[in-house]
Amino acid sequence: MQSGKILFAEQDGNYVLKFVGDVRLTLCSTLDHFLETMLDNQGFKAVIIDLTETDGIDSTSLGLIAKISVKMKQRHQLRPTIVSTNEDISRILLSMGFDKVFFLIQERATPQVPLSELSPMQESEQSVRQRVLDAHRVLMELNDSNRDSFRDLVRSLECD
């Protein structure tokens, strides 16, 4: 598995986020910062999240992706789109309830646009811990199964 990276493009308020390789906790600060900037953009219209080249993705990254849907609904009354052609990734998305808060497309449908890589950010351990905690809280809100799966992790992070 190649190490993960996140690519992006923006045109006229329409964003594409492409997750490549093995996307893990190490990219959570980078992703969360970009998402806040994107969603605060006055010209924001839509986002497509392309997981067609994603080999693996951890629960923190999934929680941050879920946060996109929550924030888009709150701020713009919109529902984002996820494109995934990897059966394993698609199965994870469905099991975690992403089909309830995203449009899921399981065929390659991402516009071919030039993409730039998000520069990795470094943050304190405490900041990363808070992002991990917030991401898992978002996942817990999606369904009862997630609530059961992440309850102990969230409690542990809250106690630290």
Whereabouts are the PLM-identified features?
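STAS-like cytosolic regulatory interaction modules
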Residues: 1-53, 70-160
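Histidine-anchored nucleotide/phosphate-binding helix
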Residues: 65-69
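Residues immediately C-terminal
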Residues: 56
